Swiss-Prot record:
Pfam families: SHMT. Its cofactor is pyridoxal 5'-phosphate. Transmembrane segments: none annotated. The record marks 225 as: Plays an important role in substrate specificity. It comes from Methanosarcina barkeri (strain Fusaro / DSM 804). (6S)-5,6,7,8-tetrahydrofolate binds at residues 117, 121-123, 242, 350-352. This is Serine hydroxymethyltransferase. InterPro entries: PyrdxlP-dep_Trfase, PyrdxlP-dep_Trfase_major, PyrdxlP-dep_Trfase_small, Ser_HO-MeTrfase, Ser_HO-MeTrfase-like, Ser_HO-MeTrfase_PLP_BS, SHMT-like_dom. It is an enzyme of class 2 (transferase).
Length: 412
């Protein structure tokens, strides 16, 4: 009997059911993955008991000798995998990391140019409902209506017109490669700081599957889960020592008190795992799987935003399928496939309904699935969406998905 089962049977039952859901449902949520048992062991360790306000060697509490080792390991490993000079591993989240960057060099009312949420950006990049949209003047940019991809000449034009203090590149639902070098040139043209948010593609960057922004951006932020397969948390990479000093002050005492030392330990484990050849192979396979799934869906008549993918995710515009993103998400769920509704470029529906779904391959790749399975999954997706109101067919598809998942256990 586990400690949780003995102490809190109700919670234990919920965790047990969640474990079963993760095992037998097909996870195509682009921002989710499976952390290793080693990462989870670090997260559940006695390090959760320790307060450690400040930074390694300069704490406001005694008894930090060993948690200093954990943080030092996380920093050194992050520097190595990203080929970076300055890293802060204390942010509790990706949004918090972005907030720290803004507060380190901007003041309220300054102008930030960032990707519109409905075109693939992120809430923390300036959405009106986010702190970023409330505190700063946001100039949104989007994709070309013709190509559904970024048009860098248009971005240059917009930057010159608005002269932002900061430009944010990176996205939560953009399937194509981002040219960080061109973003640097645009930022330099108007004297803006450049922040690259690589929360979604960090694992791909580490493995060399996607170009790195580190040589170009003043700041790089990321979550440590998603393609990195670590614990839920954030990191910040700074280009210079002066910027790193600003970041450290913005994180603590600016935004946070005590860092989560058990999570930082989990980050250290994940960064070590990211140095392995297996990790690199998985990132390469993640993109191969995404390209295969995208190709198969396109051949079945689905409208794939921008026509292809260069990374771990794809966006499906469902307008030609006469189904909303909300209804497609529900149908897929009944078929045992977990995805999320998503706005598409030039969206006409509300964010609660949407015209699209976002699909990603990190989690199923971590399970060991490859191109052959992607072809099967495309069939299951087509069946679910074209039979969204037929519970019998959806149930039969769910059985097939369960059988597929049973051949690729999450934790062997």
């Amino acid at each position: 009997m586990s400690y949780i089962e003995k102490t809190d049977p109700e919670l234990f039952e919920a965790i047990k059911k969640e474990a079963e859901r993760q095992e037998y449902k097909l996870n195509l949520i682009a921002s989710e993955n499976y952390a290793s048992k080693a990462v989870m062991e670090a997260q559940g360790s006695i390090l959760t008991n320790k307060y450690a306000e400040g930074y390694s060697g300069k704490r406001y509490y005694g008894g930090c000798d060993f948690v200093d080792i954990a943080e030092d390991l996380a920093i050194a490993r992050a520097k190595k995998i990203f080929n970076a000079g300055y890293v802060n591993v204390q942010p509790h989240s990706g949004s918090g990391a972005n907030m720290a960057v803004y507060f380190s060099v901007l003041k309220p009312g300054d102008t930030i140019m960032s990707m519109d949420l409905s075109h693939g950006g992120h809430l923390s990049h300036g959405s009106p409902v986010s702190f970023s949209g409330k505190l700063f003047n946001i100039v949104p940019y989007g994709v070309s209506k013709k190509t559904e991809m970024l048009d860098y000449s248009e971005l240059m034009k917009k930057a010159k017109e608005n002269k932002p203090q900061m430009i944010v590149c990176g996205a939560s639902a953009y399937p194509r490669e981002i040219d960080f070098k061109q973003f640097r040139e645009i930022a330099d043209e108007v004297g803006a700081y450049l922040l690259a948010d690589i929360a979604h593609i960090a694992g791909l960057v580490v493995a060399g599957v996607h170009p790195s922004p580190v040589p170009y951006a003043d700041f790089v932020t990321s979550t440590t889960h998603k393609t990195l397969r670590g614990p839920r948390g954030g990191i910040i990479i700074s280009k210079t020592e002066e910027l790193a000093t600003r970041i450290n002050k913005a994180v603590f005492p600016g935004l946070q008190g005590g860092p989560l030392m058990h999570i930082i330990a989990g980050k250290a484990v994940a960064f070590k795992e990211a140095m392995s050849e297996k990790f690199k192979q998985d990132q390469v396979q993640t993109v191969k799987n995404a390209k295969t799934l995208c190709k198969c869906l396109k051949e079945k008549g689905f409208d794939m935003v921008s026509g292809d993918t260069d990374n771990h995710l794809m966006l499906v515009n469902l307008n030609n399928m006469n189904i909303t993103g909300k209804d497609a998400e529900a149908a897929l769920s009944k078929a045992g496939i977990i995805a999320n509704k998503n706005t598409v470029p030039f969206e006409t529906r509300s964010p609660f309904i949407t015209s699209g779904v976002r699909l990603g391959t990190p989690a199923c790749t971590t399970r060991g699935m490859k191109e052959t399975e992607m072809e099967l999954i495309a069939d299951y997706i087509e069946t679910a969406i074209t039979n969204s109101e037929n519970d019998k067919i959806l149930s039969e598809t769910s059985d097939k998905v369960r059988e597929l998942c049973s051949r690729f256990p999450v934790y062997c």
